[in-house]
């Protein structure tokens, strides 16, 4: 992996193996998700919104460094402008601004589409993700205590959201 600035591209089927591999690394790391297995590619693409999913690519070798994608929180019309997102960065690419660049791309695409709120759940132990989200304009809404079990222990999840100042 080079240390050059990353390139952001739309997430496409050709990225499937790398994206699901990074998802797997997040699961194995223990502080990214309550999931125990990555979804199939078919399920991944069926549940994430087209036009609002991106990969960060290393301009040196073309490798995928991370990804971001979102899905609607509800099919009710009142929540049409509210999405939940996930952002994952390969462990070897952390500290390079990959997550920040991915969040910026997601914010730009969702605002252009009239989406007014982006939210996510983050484990309180994931200080780097909480800091990155705060720097991108997300605020902590609250903590959902004992939301789910992981490896025989209850996990809390911090709910963060970003309300777009561009959508009034």
Label the model's feature ranges.
Residues 6-19:
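A short beta-loop-alpha structural element at the N-terminal edge
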Residues 69-72, 77, 121-122, 134, ...:
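Conserved catalytic-core motifs of GNAT/GCN5-like acyltransferases
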Residues 13, 21-37:
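Helix-loop element at the rim of GNAT/NAT acetyltransferase active sites that forms part
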Residues 32, 36-92, 103-104, 109, ...:
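Acetyl-CoA-dependent GNAT
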Residues 94, 120-130:
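Conserved beta-strand-loop-alpha-helix junction that forms the acyl-donor binding cleft
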Residues 110-122:
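Conserved GNAT acetyl-CoA-binding A-motif
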Residues 95-108, 130-135:
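Conserved acetyl-CoA-binding loop-helix of GNAT-fold acetyltransferases
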